[in-house]
Structures are given as C-alpha cells and as structure tokens.
Curated annotation (Swiss-Prot):
Gene3D superfamilies (UniProt xref): Influenza RNA-dependent RNA polymerase subunit PA, endonuclease domain (3.40.91.90)
Keyword Repeat: no
Protein known as: Polymerase acidic protein
Motif (Nuclear localization signal 2 (NLS2)): 184-247
C-alpha cells in the first residue's frame, strides 16, 4: 500500500501526510491504510479549491491553469495540511476579519464567497452514516459539511453542494480512479474495511481502551499500572530523590540540594579597577557626520566621490594638534597620518579624473600605525622543534576594569530617536493569505517604531563599514586603502542624505583563515571633548582639527571639532557578522511578536493593532536601581533593538560566557517568583562561572549591573 500511495499521489501531498502522521505519533509503515486515507483527503481538499477564484466584483469564477488573470483572490483558504499552530492562527485571523464564529475543531477549508468554514469528508462507507458522524462531532450549524464517497455519491449540508457540477465530477472521477487502482492491486478490500467512525473526545477526560493499555505498558520499572505511577508522581518530592541518586553515583559526589529562597541569592561582584574604556569598532553617540542632502554630483554612490563632496561642506579646518595623547602610542604618527589623508585627498581633487579607490602612500607613520612588519616572523615547526626552551608567549592576565557611567549613556542614546529615517518599509506586494497580512502589519508597525532609532543608524553604519572593509581586504590585499565611513538615510521630508563619519585606512590583508586579522586605523569626526571622560578614550589619540559653527538658541556658536584616531583590527568572520547586522532588526521583531502572541492567545484574537495603537498603555522595559522602568510600545521596540545591536557591536567571549551562565541564575530566580520552590546545589560554582566573565568589557559590566538591579526588585 505504501508503494501505491507514493506512486499514485503528488509528492507534496505525500510529504504533508507523512508530517500529519508524525504529528499524531503514527507509523506510516504500520498504518498504511491511514496513510492512503490522509493522502486522499488532502487531494480532495486541494481539488475542491483548485481553479476557484473571486474577481474584483466579488463574483466567484473558474479560471483554468495558464490564464493570465490567475492573480485573482483564491475563493477557498486551505486549512487542512498545515501544522496545527499555523492552522489555528489562520482560523483565528479569518474569524477576526470576517466575524465568522470560531469552530471547536479545525475545519478543512474556508469559503470566502459563502463566508463559511467547510468540513470535507471522504468515506468508504455510506455517505449519510459518515455525514451524521461528522455532524455529531462538530455540533455546529455554521460549519458546512460536504461528504464524498468512492462510489460517486455525495452529501452536503442542506443539499448545498457549494461547487459547480463539473468541479464535483472531477473529484468523484479521481476517487473512482483511486478505487480502481487499489482494486487492481488487491488493496481495496483491506482499505474499505479499515475505516473507523469519527472519534469524539469525551467531556470527562478519562483514559480508556487502547490509550489505557498503552499507558499501562509505558511505565518505568517497578510500577504495575498507570494509576500507581500517577499517584507516585503526584506525591513526588524531587529534592531528596536527586540527592539520593547523586550519592549512588560516586563517593566523591556529595551534593546537598539547598532550597533557593528569597534570601539566598547575593548580588554579582563587579570588578574594581580603573574605569572601562570604549572598545567598539567605530564611534557611537560621539560620532559627527559631514552630510550632503539630495546628492546628485558626478559619481554619486562611489564612496570616494561622496566622501570628497561631504568634506567640501566643511570650511573650518585648522592646523591639527594632539589634545588627548594615546598613553602607549607614538602620537606624532597619528597626527602625521591625518595630515597625510588631507594631503592625498587634496591631490585627488587636483587630478582631472577622480579615481574610484585611493591607496595611501606607505609612509613610516602608516606602517607604524598599521603594524607593518611588527608581527613576529613565522618559523616552520620542523625547523625549531629541537629548541629546548621552546614555549608559548607569556601573556599578561587582562587588567580588571570597573563599570563606568558612559556605557549606560551610550545605551540610552542608542534607544533615542534621530531626525532621519535609516530603513525603508519593504516594498512587498499584496498579501494573499490572512497570515501574510498579519505578518506584514506587524512588520510595518515595528519598522515605523524603529526606522528613526539611533540603534538602526548603528546597524546601517556597521553594515556599510564591514562590507567596505571586507571588499577592500579581498580586492587590495597589499595596499593601504583609504575607505570612507559612509551611511545613507532620508530626512523627515523624505530627501536623500549621504553622511561621512571619517575614514579607515586598512593594512595588509592576506586573510586565509576566518580568524586572520586585518589591521586598520580609524579616524572619526566628533564634537565630544575627550578631556571630559579621558578613561573612555584610553585606546584613542584625539586631535583637534577644526572649528564648527553650530546653530543654537542664542545664534551661531563655534565648537572645536575633534578627530578620534586609533589602531584597531578585525577578522573575516567578524566582518561577515558585521555585514549581517540587519539580523538585529529581525531578532527584536521576533521578541515583540512573542509579546503580541501572548496577548493574542489570552484575548483569543489578533492583538497587533491594539498593541501598537493603544498609546496610553505602558510596558516593562528593564530594571534600574529605581525599579522596573516602563515605557510605550515604541520605547520597548527601540530598547530591544538597542540590546540586540549592542550584543553585536560589543560581541566578545566575556559576553558569551556571561549570557550563558547568568541565564541559569535567571531561570532559578524566575522559578522562585513562580512559586516552584527551586532547589540548587553548588550555587557558589554558578556564581564563580558568572563572575569569571566580569573582567573589563563595558557591555558585560553594564549587563551585570542590570542583573543586580533585577535581583533586588525581583526578590522584594
């Protein structure tokens, strides 16, 4: 029978039937007749829907394949064949949009013309017997029932057959053909006799019959029947049992399960030491942009052309000087590097035709800044394995750093709105199915909340910089290429805008492995005076390079313009992930969706619209020393996005470890809040695992401080 089914039915139908049987824990190798019945039922549902459309006038029409008008609305929504969650989502959506009564059981189809759900039946017995069984099970006047048999008979509610005669004849012919094919292989009799009646779930949920036998058979050793096992589980006290099991395992294991009470957890110990410093690959809140609106210059879109055009918008350049030296670096080299960039940009402008890319002269200052010839020479292992004192470099333990307020300010700034639009709404065609309509509605609401967000600017900036750097690393491996740091956006009025943040000069980049490092020097414009928070800028040499006139309430004011210069490095794998920072949008959208789903399941209807449009409602955003912070749904969207973006910008082994280990502690605390009486052993070991990740990373230290606020408020 299984071979016959695979030959006789479309592979897609066979695959759906396999999934359905798997979902209900049935073996298609054993239940071959059931397999054939499911395939037959699926095919009838699909044939019922095929070629039936609704035109612009709302009339039902039949369109055969190959007709150019086939983009009309389908008359029937197919519910059968989808997984249960998706099927119920579609049913709920249809009920919300059409006002139809929600059925108790999943129907097979929805008819948009007659506005009713349809239950399709295919029987090997008398149609009227099967019809009565279906009606008795559904107990709903609203769901339309249509039964077909393998003998060409049919029966439908109130003799209303929904489809035209030709469409129904096509279904009956197909069923007759299946019967003939089965009979010719000697499979029909077994198939006909295997049909059971519709089974309804009793109101009192008692396990009887086959299920009861299976329950009695599927018990752990030492239990005679299901009732004994159920009684044992109901009275089970886990803590003492686990202790006993552990003591049997080994003489060394001596774990006592300690109850986890409100007084048990202590705050995480944050490290002492000098304040932590900025370690992102580009400036965040301190960045300054030189911008052009409605760019239409020759070569628009070519980064070097755009950069030169942006540089021309500023007239306040002055002789640069170091205002905050880098403690360990040769600061005159950073100064000379900036002067070299200005000089070489001037050279380009003097040329008749501006080149598309610019490779910098390999001066001594750039060689120093890019670590040229600084790497120790690699020697083949065979040539030195006889060296007696061969050993790995002694590496210093990382210096402990304390949390500094600047990282919280950075995060707050990332959640704020800017006056530009950083992402466009997707240009997506008309939605066909209700589920697509819900998805695109959620996406549009979410995009509207985050398109102006500074975190979204960081995404687009990160994508651009990483893409440009990876391209240059592959295309110009030996060159010190000058790479402008550019982003594009739209103003509130919808005008296009190109922004220049500064420049990167990349070093030699023969990147064979994913983790091979390419060095680069970044030079970024800013109005932030580094002397206000010198600890934040430990890794930078900061120059004063000009004066910028800014409009303010009292008229124009002049502010010094700074250039933040540092040597940095990245790898192929880091650039690859940097190029995919748009995933942060998807991650935070999914988090918002799960909030909407939770709300929708309580209200039993899709709550997307209410969720985003009820401006008076506030939602929890996070913990602070003051307590639980709340805000609008837009603020929640932007905060979740900023967290995701910072996880990408500040990705590190410390963050990986902290996230994984602190999650365990979080789950225990959550269990306590839910009155689940959690027990723990070696809680000290868990704290150790969390705290060994608290070294010097600003984002990890901030998360640890948030975690402590959460502990304080969660356990009040």
């Amino acid at each position: 029978m299984e071979d016959f089914v695979r030959q006789c039915f479309n592979p897609m139908i066979v695959e759906l039937a396999e999934k359905a049987m798997k979902e209900y824990g049935e073996d298609l190798k054993v239940e071959t007749n059931k397999f054939a019945a499911i395939c037959t039922h699926l095919e009838v549902c699909f044939m019922y829907s095929d070629f039936h459309f609704i035109n612009e006038q709302g009339e039902s029409i039949i369109v055969e394949l190959g007709d150019p008008n086939a983009l009309l609305k389908h008359r029937f929504e197919i519910i059968e064949g989808r997984d249960r969650t998706m099927a119920w989502t579609i049913v709920n959506s249809i009920c919300n949009t059409t006002g139809a009564e929600k059925p108790k059981f999943l129907p097979d189809l929805y008819d948009y013309k007659e506005n009713r759900f349809i239950e399709i039946g295919v029987t090997r017995r008398e149609v009227h017997i099967y019809y009565l069984e279906k009606a008795n099970k559904i107990k709903s006047e609203k769901t339309h029932i249509h039964i077909f048999s393998f003998t060409g008979e049919e029966m439908a509610t109130k003799a209303d057959y929904t489809l035209d005669e030709e469409s129904r004849a096509r279904i009956k012919t197909r069923l007759f053909t299946i019967r003939q094919e089965m009979a010719s292989r000697g499979l029909w009799d077994s198939f006909r006799q295997s049909e059971r009646g519709e089974e309804t779930i009793e109101e009192r949920f008692e396990i009887t019959g086959t299920m009861r036998k299976l329950a009695d058979q599927s018990l752990p050793p030492n239990f005679s029947c299901f009732e004994n096992f159920r009684a044992y589980v109901d009275g089970f006290e886990p803590n003492g049992y686990i202790e006993g099991k552990l003591s049997q395992m080994s003489k060394e294991v001596n774990a006592r399960i300690e109850p986890f009470l409100k007084t048990t957890p202590r705050p995480l110990k944050l490290p002492d030491g000098p304040p932590c410093s900025q370690r992102s690959k580009f400036l965040l809140m301190d960045a300054l942009k030189l911008s052009i609106e409605d760019p239409s210059h020759e070569g628009e879109g070519i980064p070097l052309y755009d950069a030169i055009k942006c540089m021309r918008t500023f007239f306040g350049w002055k002789e640069p000087n170091v205002v905050k030296p880098h403690e360990k670096g040769i600061n005159p080299n950073y100064l000379l590097s900036w002067k070299q960039v200005l000089a070489e940009l001037q050279d380009i402008e003097n040329e008749e035709k501006i080149p598309k890319t610019k490779n910098m002269k390999k001066t001594s200052q750039l060689k120093w800044a890019l670590g040229e010839n600084m790497a120790p020479e690699k020697v083949d292992f065979d040539d030195c394995k006889d060296v007696s004192d061969l050993k790995q470099y002694d590496s210093d333990e990382p210096e402990l750093r304390s949390l500094s307020s600047w990282i919280q300010n950075e995060f707050n700034k990332a959640c704020e709105l800017t006056d530009s639009i950083w992402i466009e709404l997707d240009e997506i065609g008309e939605d066909v199915a209700p589920i697509e309509h819900i998805a695109s509605m959620r996406r549009n609401y979410f995009t509207a909340e985050v398109s102006h967000c500074r975190a979204t600017e960081y995404i687009m900036k990160g994508v651009y910089i990483n893409t440009a750097l990876l391209n240059a690393s592959c295309a110009a491996m030996d060159d010190f290429q000058l790479i402008p740091m550019i982003s594009k956006c739209r103003t509130k009025e919808g005008r296009r805008k190109t922004n220049l943040y500064g420049f990167i000069i990349k070093g030699r980049s023969h990147l064979r492995n994913d983790t091979d490092v390419v060095n680069f020097v970044s030079m970024e414009f800013s109005l932030t005076d580094p002397r206000l928070e010198p600890h934040k800028w430990e890794k930078y040499c900061v120059l004063e390079i000009g004066d910028m006139l800014l409009r303010s309430a009292i008229g124009q004011v002049s502010r010094p313009m700074f250039l933040y210069v540092r040597t940095n490095g990245t790898s192929k794998i880091k650039m690859k992930w940097g190029m995919e920072m748009r995933r942060c949008l998807l991650q935070s959208l999914q988090q918002i969706e799960s909030m909407i789903e939770a709300e929708s399941s309580v209200k039993e209807k899709d709550m997307t619209k209410e969720f985003f449009e009820n401006k008076s409602e506030t939602w929890p955003i996070g913990e602070s020393p003051k307590g639980v912070e709340e805000g609008s749904i837009g603020k929640v969207c932007r905060t979740l996005l900023a967290k995701s973006v910072f996880n990408s910008l500040y990705a590190s082994p410390q963050l990986e470890g902290f996230s994984a280990e602190s999650r365990k502690l979080l789950l225990i605390v959550q269990a306590l809040r839910d009155n689940l009486e959690p027990g723990t052993f070696d809680l000290g070991g868990l704290y150790e695992a969390v705290e060994e990740c608290l070294i010097n990373d600003p984002w990890v230290l901030l998360n640890a401080s948030w975690f402590n606020s959460f502990l304080t408020h969660a356990l009040r």
